[in-house]
Amino acid sequence: MPRHSVFALSILALSITATVWIPTVQAETNLLRREFYGPVNPELFAAFLDDHDARGRENQRDFSSGSGTNELVDELSPVSERETLERFGKRNIDEIDRTAFDNFFKRNLDEIDRVGWSGFVKRLTNYLATTGHGTNTGGPVLTRRFG
């Protein structure tokens, strides 16, 4: 028992140390990044965001693609880049992910419908009667009810 409590306390101490130490390490500025890009001026960053927000609102157009969403058109991008992006059709990712799931259950429901629920119940009662799993007092209870 003492070994268990020592182990639990050591795990607790390690987790507390990691919880305190990791965010402080991640919050420090990377020296390589600071040397490469230079110090970040907050005013420059705010001006950058303002410029891009204004530019985005000016170039926002509504396309009748059926989705009803607005898309940003970049007037400065070359035509070749836009053509490569437009080459791929717009697809709903949820639809793509659901198809395999839906097909699996549709197939199984079709198999049940072919046999019918009455056939399923008869096969279940026959199985339970022959294996003896459906007996309370030694006799086939389900066979007497449904058969």
Curated annotation (Swiss-Prot):
Superkingdom of the organism of origin: Eukaryota
UniProt entry tagged with the keyword Secreted: yes
Removed propeptide positions: 28-89, 146-147
Any one GO biological process: neuropeptide signaling pathway
Main location: secreted
Signal peptide: 1-27
Function: Myotropic peptides.
Annotated family: Belongs to the orcokinin family.
Protein name (database record): Orcokinin peptides
